[in-house]
Swiss-Prot record:
Protein's job: Protein S19 forms a complex with S13 that binds strongly to the 16S ribosomal RNA.
The protein's name: Small ribosomal subunit protein uS19
Claim: Ribosomal protein is one of the keywords in the record: yes
Organism: Dehalococcoides mccartyi (strain ATCC BAA-2100 / JCM 16839 / KCTC 5957 / BAV1)
Pfam family, one: Ribosomal_S19
Keywords in alphabetical order: Ribonucleoprotein, Ribosomal protein, RNA-binding, rRNA-binding
Superkingdom field: Bacteria
GO molecular function: rRNA binding; structural constituent of ribosome
Amino acid sequence: MSRSVKKGPALCPKLMKKVEVASATNQKSIIKTWARWSTITPLMVGLNVGVHDGRRHVPIYITENMVGHKLGEFTTTRNFRGHAKAEKVSQVK
């Protein structure tokens, strides 16, 4: 289900202040954020945003195709290391 048009997009006010300052001054540094739930707006296009994945900030370059999506969609929070090999399982027994 999508968010109501009446409510508008979900945006973090602190993140939007940082984005406005960065776009006005043409900063190319990474904007760190923990707000994975924030929606990407057209104002963010061309900026580098560091989205927190629970351990570190993953740098993401925002493009036009990302507008309307959430920041958290572009970083994974879980690392799959693979299942145990058959050799290791037989040694444990």
